[in-house]
Structure formats: structure tokens, C-alpha cells
């Protein structure tokens, strides 16, 4: 059990190091560029401006005000898209690094149970959580599963600590895959 605990701590340490490496790469390729800084400031400004306009608008607002808000939303959406495209080049570099490091560490931890899950994972996740492990105990956790979970959560927290995470206003306006859905029927 003590080797399992040591493996778990080592994987968390590896995740912290790879997350710091990823943020370092992103800083070099993206965050320090003038284009990124300009776009980020523009998105922040537009998000706050749009939020204020939406708060002050009433149901009986004229078509003119609604059109202005729609134009501003479109401009914000375009700037968010441009910001995502600027970040894209670092995503390729980070993806390459993570894949190489994951392959290397996966070969080190191959076939070793690194943690014991307090639950039985869903059947479609078991292929990842029990990858390359012998036995039928589905609560055994493989390196790859723990590494992915740690890296995802640690990287987000490192971004928040370093002040590199997108602001709440920009995230709220952008929507996206995990963001809130855009309000429907409000201005149409």
C-alpha cells in the first residue's frame, strides 16, 4: 500500500510539473504576445460593456437598442474566436509534449496499480481507469486515468493562480462547450 501511495504522490508531482511546463510554453508562445494582450483586453472591455447594456435594457426597448446589442455580441464572438485562434498554436505544442510525456511515464507505470478508486467507474470509463492492469478489480486505478484527472484539475488551478485563466465575464459571454447556453428568445 505504501508504494501505491508513493506512486500517487509521484503522479500528482508529475502532473504539477507538466502543467507548469504547459503554462510556460503557453506563456512563451501566446500570453506575452502583443496580439494576445490586445485581444484579451478588447474581450474584457466588450464583455463588461455588453453586460452593462444587458442589465439596463428593458422589455420595451426599441429595435435600435436590440440591434446594437446584437452587433456587440457578434463583435465579441468574433474577438473570442480570434483569441482562441491565437491560443491554438500553443495547444499543438502542449498536446505534443503531453503525448510524449504521457507515453514515457505510461511505460514506467505500465501494469502497476497506482491508486484505489472509492467507486466503480462507469463502464465506458473503465477502459481508461483500468488500462494495462491485470485482474478484474475495477476499482484499481491505472497511471493514465490518475494522470489525466490530475493534469486537468491542476492545470486549471495553476492558470487561476498565475492569473492566466479567462475572466468570468468573458467566459460567461463566450458560452462554449461547458459554458452556460446563450439566452434564447430574449432579443428576438
Swiss-Prot record:
**Molecular function terms, GO-annotated:** calcium channel activity; ribosome binding
Question: Topologically, how does it sit relative to the membrane?
Answer: Multi-pass membrane protein
Q: Topological domains (Cytoplasmic): residue ranges?
A: 33-86, 163-188
Name of the protein: Calcium load-activated calcium channel
> Per the UniProt entry, what are the Gene Ontology biological process annotations, in alphabetical order?
calcium ion transmembrane transport; endoplasmic reticulum calcium ion homeostasis; ER overload response; multi-pass transmembrane protein insertion into ER membrane; ossification
Q: Which residues lie on this side of the membrane: Lumenal?
A: 1-4, 107-120, 131-140
Pfam short name (any one): EMC3_TMCO1
Gene this chain is encoded by = TMCO1
Q: What is its main location?
A: endoplasmic reticulum
Similarity comment: family membership = Belongs to the TMCO1 family.
Those portions of the chain lying inside the lipid bilayer but not traversing it, as listed in its UniProt record, are located at 121-130
- Transmembrane stretches in the record are 5-32, 87-106, 141-162
Keywords, A to Z?
A: Calcium, Calcium channel, Calcium transport, Coiled coil, Endoplasmic reticulum, Golgi apparatus, Ion channel, Ion transport, Membrane, Mitochondrion, Phosphoprotein, Transmembrane, Transmembrane helix, Transport
Which PANTHER family would you find in this protein's record?
CALCIUM LOAD-ACTIVATED CALCIUM CHANNEL (PTHR20917:SF0), PNAS-RELATED (PTHR20917)
Amino acid at each position: 500500500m505504501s508504494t501505491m501511495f508513493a506512486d500517487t504522490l509521484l503522479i500528482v508531482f508529475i502532473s504539477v510539473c507538466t502543467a507548469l511546463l504547459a503554462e510556460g510554453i503557453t506563456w512563451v508562445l501566446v500570453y506575452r504576445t502583443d496580439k494576445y494582450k490586445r485581444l484579451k483586453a478588447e474581450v474584457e472591455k466588450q464583455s463588461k460593456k455588453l453586460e452593462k447594456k444587458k442589465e439596463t435594457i428593458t422589455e420595451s426597448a426599441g429595435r435600435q437598442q436590440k440591434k446594437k446589442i446584437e452587433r456587440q455580441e457578434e463583435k465579441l464572438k468574433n474577438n473570442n474566436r480570434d483569441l482562441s485562434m491565437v491560443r491554438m498554436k500553443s495547444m499543438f505544442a502542449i498536446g505534443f509534449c503531453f503525448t510524449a510525456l504521457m507515453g514515457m511515464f505510461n511505460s514506467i507505470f505500465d501494469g502497476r496499480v497506482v491508486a484505489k478508486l472509492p467507486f466503480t467507474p462507469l463502464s465506458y470509463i473503465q477502459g481508461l481507469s483500468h488500462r494495462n492492469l491485470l485482474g478484474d478489480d475495477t476499482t484499481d486505478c491505472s497511471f493514465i486515468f490518475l494522470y489525466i484527472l490530475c493534469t486537468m484539475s491542476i492545470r486549471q488551478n495553476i492558470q487561476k493562480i498565475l492569473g492566466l485563466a479567462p475572466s468570468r465575464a468573458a467566459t460567461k459571454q463566450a458560452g462554449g462547450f461547458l459554458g452556460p447556453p446563450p439566452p434564447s428568445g430574449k432579443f428576438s
